[in-house]
Amino acid sequence: MFTFLKIILWLFSLALASAININDITFSNLEITPLTANKQPDQGWTATFDFSIADASSIREGDEFTLSMPHVYRIKLLNSSQTATISLADGTEAFKCYVSQQAAYLYENTTFTCTAQNDLSSYNTIDGSITFSLNFSDGGSSYEYELENAKFFKSGPMLVKLGNQMSDVVNFDPAAFTENVFHSGRSTGYGSFESYHLGMYCPNGYFLGGTEKIDYDSSNNNVDLDCSSVQVYSSNDFNDWWFPQSYNDTNADVTCFGSNLWITLDEKLYDGEMLWVNALQSLPANVNTIDHALEFQYTCLDTIANTTYATQFSTTREFIVYQGRNLGTASAKSSFISTTTTDLTSINTSAYSTGSISTVETGNRTTSEVISHVVTTSTKLSPTATTSLTIAQTSIYSTDSNITVGTDIHTTSEVISDVETISRETASTVVAAPTSTTGWTGAMNTYISQFTSSSFATINSTPIISSSAVFETSDASIVNVHTENITNTAAVPSEEPTFVNATRNSLNSFCSSKQPSSPSSYTSSPLVSSLSVSKTLLSTSFTPSVPTSNTYIKTKNTGYFEHTALTTSSVGLNSFSETAVSSQGTKIDTFLVSSLIAYPSSASGSQLSGIQQNFTSTSLMISTYEGKASIFFSAELGSIIFLLLSYLLF
């Protein structure tokens, strides 16, 4: 049993020792602004600042960083638990922050601590912003640190530091003493309220004696007066907010009971001395106002008029405890390796950065940031045919996103710049359909087509697609032709359209019984009696990082057979166009199909009287915006391609 307890204690000690301070953190950009129109140090203020952790790779759960702030009376957060959580955009709780020490009237410094709620070692850096409410300690008692701070603060512009890394110039207003009594009060953070009253004022002379009665709970809010905390002294040395910088003892008779304090002083106070009282009261939960009722009766000697006069008055002072504010935002950059395997035996390894941002609690603050991403992808596809296609692509683009998190409206605009380099070696697949004869006894030419497509164009320094083609056939009447058309377009600024035009040459061949003497008429065989079909499928697949553009094709087909993306000498012209329009996407599969389909004449037993070879010029136009462009085939040809590719791959 003793050994078991030793193990428990050892594990507990180990857990405490494993939590380390995060020292590689910097604080900057401090802004201190007033919460109210009253710009005195002991009133409410808002502090906002940035923090940055340059190397987050060693941060584990339980690690923490602390900001120590002298001259700060207390920090006040929004919720009742007095904690603030800073989360990332993916929902990960990065830090939970709390006030580990309120200086109040007890300590020299107020400390603010943030503890890591999760293992954050997967992030390279963490940057964020923190906002909370505070008030400064500028005196009001005989407590050691409050008395020191009464001498520190001055009215007017003043450089105020929070910690040892950041500071801000704050313009403090002085306090006016226009009545017979001056009041001040603030909550301590320890379930109590500290109040200060200054009175027994005798202008043009000195104080002869009198009484002062204070009810610290005139509204019956169950506020208890801490009689042991009562301080009754005199002073004529005050700072700009009428708090004593030094004080003198008195022989006052002090009676404390319940929420009441009675003070009787039968001695003279010279040279502008006045009587001040400091006391602590309990602060019940959910109590936001505290009312003090004061009664004064005292006698003064006017040395100028050489007269003695009595002053008697009563007043009520209401203290309102303001609600605290806090706001926390954070962004992180992560680095990790991901591996993906597809049915094409493709392995993609990418090292890249992701960015996130979030807004926690309440407040209204906008944070703009730029996150740079670098992506490198290397893909090697196992060859399945003899025709090679090499595609090199480099793309640079930017995207925008807005995120709003928390109870207040908080928008963070994020600009992400991505640089991606893709190098691929892809093989094509050739599928040859068997030759068959139906309803035709004459001579027949069999066409076997092989199509090689490679392409290159430039959009904003981004290589994309143009075309070339090689056609081979056993028919000596058709000449082997290699056509290559490349169009380059220089980079243009973002949000300006870029147009890339490429020309694809195609062959439409017709089997007909057209007579040479009558070029304007011909007859054709029924489409149902096809002779042969030879198809070549070239499939290239790549994954660019840019959003894609959809391409749709308008084509005019003849009634006989059609060669798509093939070239030869021809006597006629026909055309179809492809137009690219902007759309969103992250992957594009490009399929090019060439087909040769022969149909016989309707005359039984006749020979093909001639071949009409129809040259088709294909115009491809790609419209890009903000540097985003790629190709995706759709419409009728796209549907055929998709079915063919699905059949081959699956």
Curated annotation (Swiss-Prot):
Annotated effect of mutating residue 298 to H: Decreases secreted alpha-agglutinin activity by less than 2-fold
Induction comment: By exposition to pheromone (A-factor) secreted by the opposite mating type cells (type A).
PTM notes: N-glycosylated, and O-glycosylated by both PMT1 and PMT2.
Region of interest (2 X 40 AA tandem repeats), ranges: 339-423
Domain of life of the organism encoding this protein: Eukaryota
Effect noted on mutating residue 296 to Y: Decreases secreted alpha-agglutinin activity by more than 20-fold
UniProt keyword Glycoprotein, yes or no: yes
Effect caused by changing residue 216 to S: Decreases secreted alpha-agglutinin activity by 100-fold
Effect of residue 322 to F: Decreases secreted alpha-agglutinin activity by 15-fold
Annotated localization: Secreted, Cell wall; Membrane
Residue ranges of Sequence repeats: 339-378, 384-423
Record's function text: Cell surface glycoprotein promoting cell-cell contact to facilitate mating. S.cerevisiae A and alpha cells express the complementary cell surface glycoproteins A-agglutinin and alpha-, respectively, which interact with one another to promote cellular aggregation during mating.
Subunit structure: Interacts with AGA2.
Protein name per its UniProtKB record: Alpha-agglutinin
Annotated source species: Saccharomyces cerevisiae (strain ATCC 204508 / S288c) (Baker's yeast)
Organism ancestry: Eukaryota, Fungi, Dikarya, Ascomycota, Saccharomycotina
